[in-house]
Amino acid sequence: WVIPLLPLPVIMSMGFGLFFIPTATKNLRRIWAFPSVLFLSIAIVYSVHLSIQQINGSSIYQYLWSWTVNNDFSLEFGYLIDPLTSIMLILITTVGILVLIYSDGYMSHDEGYLRFFVYISFFTTSMLGLVTSSNLIQIYFFWELVGMCSYLLIGFWFTRPIAASACQKAFVTNRVGDFGLLLGILGFFWITGSLEFRDLFKIANNWIPNNGINSLLTTLCAFLLFLGAVAKSAQFPLHVWLPDAMEGPTPISALIHAATMVAAGIFLLARLFPLFISIPLIMTLISLVGTITLFLGATLALAQRDIKRSLAYSTMSQLGYMMLALGIGSYQAALFHLITHAYSKALLFLGSGSVIHSMEPLVGYSPDKSQNMVLMGGLRKYIPITRTTFLWGTLSLCGIPPLACFWSKDEILSNSWLYSPFFGIIASFTAGLTAFYMFRIYLLSFDGYLRVHFQNYSTTKEGSLYSISLWGKKISKGVNRDFVLSRTKNGVSFFSQNRPQIQGNTRNRIGCFSTSFGAKNNFSYPHETGNTMLFPLLILLFFTLFIGFIGISFDNGAMDNGIAELTLLSKWLTPSINLTQESSNSFINSYEFITNAISSVSLAIIGLFIAYILYGSAYSFFQNLNFINSFYKESPKKYFFDQVKKKIYSWSYNRGYIDIFYTRVFTLGIRGLTELTEFFDKGIIDGITNGVGLVSFCIGEG
C-alpha cells in the first residue's frame, strides 16, 4: 500500500509552496523535479521487490480493512498483489520516471511547469492505486482519478480553444463508459452481494454448473463493465477522444498511451478475466470490438499529417490487438503486447516530442506547423540520436524481429488464426498496414529534405503540399531540393513572423551559428534536444530492444522428463497452470512458430517496402521511369485506381467520417432537442399558465 502513496508528499509540498510562498516556489521550480523522480525511484525498488516475490513464491498478498460498516453493508479498502499487479507496477513506475525526467527538459520554458508536475505525479499515483485495488468500488474510485488527471493534462494549455475542446471531448466520451462501469459494478453487487474480486471469481466459477443466476442479467452487467474499458482504452465506437487528446504536452501523451489512461481499460479486462471468460457472449463481443478497432485505427492512421495524431491512431490499433487477444482467451499474449507496446510507444511519443522541439525554432510554437509532417523531412541530419531511437521504435511496432513488439504481436496473430480465420485474416492484414503507416511517419519526418520553406502551405486541397498525402510525395515544380536552412533578414524563420503567442506556454528557441570569421549570425535550424530529453529515449530504446525476450521460450532443465519449454512470462503469469507438453510436440511448436513468424515478418516487410516506394528516396527514381509512367498514363484503369485512392484517402484523412456523424447526430441532435424542449416549456407550458392567468384577470376586471 506504500507504493501508490510515495508520490503524494511531493504533490502536497508543491501545493503548500504554491499556496503560502508562491514566488519562492516558482523561482526554484526546477528543483521540484528531483524529489518527484526520487520518490518514484523508491516506488520502482518496491515494485521490483514485489515482482521477485511473485516469481519465487507465486503467492497473492491481500490485506483488507473496513472502510464503512453497518449492520447490512461493509465496504472494504485494501490492496491486491499478484503477477498482474506486479507487471503493471513495474510498467507504470519505469515509464513514469522516464517521462518525469523528459518533462524537466521539455517543459522547462513553460510557465505551467509546476502545475504540470503536480498533475503528472498525481496521475501516476492514481494509476498505481488502480492496479493495486482489491475490489471493484476501489478500482472505480481510482478510475475516476485517472480520468480527472488525464482531462487536466489534455487541456493543460487551456488558453488554446482547441485544447479546451479536446479536454471537453475526452470528458464527455469517457462519461459514457464510466457510467456503464458504475452500473455494471452495482449490478454485480446486487447479484453476488460482494465487490471483492476473490468472491466474484468464486461465484463466477459456479455459474455454469449451478445455473442459479440469471444469465441475461449477468451478461448485461458484464457488458456494462466492458463498456467502461471500451471508453478508457479508446475502442470503437468510443475512440473519438484519443486523437484530440494530442493537444496536451507530448510527455503526457507518452504516459497516457503507454502506461496509464488507455492501459487502464486493458488492465480492467485482465483483472476481471476469470469473470468474463465464464460468459462466452461477452468474450465474443470483446474479440469483435478489438478486431474492428485494430483495423479501423490502422486505416485512419494512413493519411494523417500530424505526427502525434498518427501515433495516437497507432495506439488505438494496438489496443485493438490486446482486446482481440483477451477476447479469444489469449491472456498472456494480451499482457505481453501491453508490455512491449508500452515501451515502444513511449519511445515513439517522446521521440516525436524531440522532433517537435527541433521544429519550433523554425515554425514557432504552433502545433499545426511544428507537429505537421508535411513541413518536416531530412531531420536525420540534424537530430541523429532522435532519428536512431525513433527508427528502432518504428521497426519494433512494425513487428521486425528481434525487437519487442515482434514477439507479442506474432503470438497474437498465431492465436487469432487458431481461434478463427476471420480474426486471423484481419489481424494479419492490419499488421501490414501498421508497417506501412509507421514507416510513412518515419520517412516523412526524417527522410528526404527539409520542406519547411513552403511559405504558402495550407491544409486545403489547393495548398502546395496537399499532394503529400497517402500516396507519396508528389513534389511541386518550384521546390529547391538543396534547401537546408530557412533564413530571413532578421535571422529567424518566416513562420516566426506570424507566431501565435499563447500566454504562458511559449517556448522560443533560436539556434545560433558562429562563422569562421567570428561574426555571429542567427539561423533557424533543427537541433538535437538536451541530455535530460535524450536520456529517457536511450533507456526506452534498451527496453525496446530487449524486453521482448521475456516471452521467448527457454529450457527449464526438465526436458528428460518430457517437459517442454516455457517462457518467463508464462511462468510468471500462470504459475498454477500446468503448462507442460510432450517433448515430441516441442519441435512441432517450434516449426509452427517459425512458419508464423515468416508470415508476419513478410507482411511487415511488404508494408515497409510500399511505404519506402511512396515516401522514400526511391519515389523520385520511379517517377523518372518514363516507360512505366507512360504505360500507367495510358492504362484504362488509371481513372478507376485514382478514384479508389481518393476514396481511401478521404476516409482516412476525415477520420472515417465518424466524428462528423457524431457531431451531426448527437451534438446537433441534442442541441435541437434542447431548443425544442425550451420552446415547449416557454411557449406552451408557460403560455398555458400565463394564458389562464390573463383570462382570469380579464374576467375579474370585467
Swiss-Prot record:
Single GO MF descriptor: NADH dehydrogenase (ubiquinone) activity
Pfam families, alphabetized: Proton_antipo_C (PF01010), Proton_antipo_M (PF00361), Proton_antipo_N (PF00662)
Any one of the GO BP annotations: ATP synthesis coupled electron transport
Lineage, opening ranks: Eukaryota, Viridiplantae, Streptophyta, Embryophyta, Tracheophyta
Keywords tagged on the record: Chloroplast, Membrane, NAD, NADP, Plastid, Plastoquinone, Quinone, Thylakoid, Translocase, Transmembrane, Transmembrane helix, Transport
Superkingdom of source: Eukaryota
Protein name: NAD(P)H-quinone oxidoreductase subunit 5, chloroplastic
Disulfide bonds: none
Membrane topology: Multi-pass membrane protein
Membrane-crossing residue ranges in chain numbering: 1-21, 31-51, 81-101, 117-137, 139-159, 177-197, 211-231, 250-270, 272-292, 319-339, 346-366, 388-408, 417-437, 534-554, 602-622
